[in-house]
A protein has these predicted regions:
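Glycine/Thr-rich phosphate-binding loops that ligate phosphate moieties of nucleotide
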Residues: 1-195
Length: 195
């Protein structure tokens, strides 16, 4: 479905902060949002913009690493999202780095943690050699240069929308409106209770 929509989702932008921002770059009060919706927007646009929005947020983190002096030749991907070829390509195109999908993507975090623990307690002397023996790439994605300009502009739009909406998120945090409690029951403001 998402592959039927061009890069940039025809200007539909998704901010994926459904749980606030959990990295140190933004606000824990941030919320998710779709921007750029029109009568021409369909489910395919929403699906692709959701994938792209997650990648814009991740790109923001990668850019912070780069600005601090870290550099990447390629990135390794794991988890459930790696089972989507279109999402892997979108990630690669937005990050502008090759993406290596690991063979055992579901367990690669455990393998990595075990290798680090082994190194930490002195069981592993040559981490590079042990990693080569235990971590295998299933497939590699390379950036598509035809979408580079579109994604660069959409990354700017993402940052502008994110920054512009921060005061709105702060306002909503303190607004007297319907909220959901931690136990998943609804609470309402006094305005709703009196009606």
């Amino acid at each position: 479905m998402a592959s039927s929509v061009p890069a940039g989702s025809d200007g539909v932008l998704f901010l994926p902060q459904l749980l606030g921002e959990r990295e140190n770059l933004g606000s824990p009060d941030a919320k998710g949002a779709f921007i750029g919706l029109s009568f021409d927007t369909d489910l395919a646009h929403l699906c692709r913009s959701l994938m792209e929005g997650v990648c814009y947020a991740e790109r923001r983190i990668l850019d912070a690493f780069t600005q601090s002096g870290m550099h990447f030749n390629a990135l390794y991907s794991r988890g459930g999202g790696v089972n989507s070829r279109i999402w892997n390509q979108i990630r690669c195109d937005i990050y502008q780095h090759p993406i290596h999908v690991l063979e055992d993507a579901d367990n690669s975090g455990l393998i990595g943690a075990a290798l680090l623990a082994g190194k930490g307690v002195g069981l592993i002397q040559n981490m590079e050699q042990v990693a080569k023996e235990n971590i295998h790439v299933r497939e590699t994605y390379y950036p598509n240069t035809s979408s580079q300009a579109t994604y660069a502009e959409m990354q700017k739009a993402y940052m502008a929308a994110h920054n512009a909406l921060l005061p709105t998120f702060e306002f909503l945090k303190h607004a007297n409106i319907v909220t959901r409690n931690e136990d998943a029951s609804f609470s309402t403001s006094s305005t709703f209770e009196n009606n």
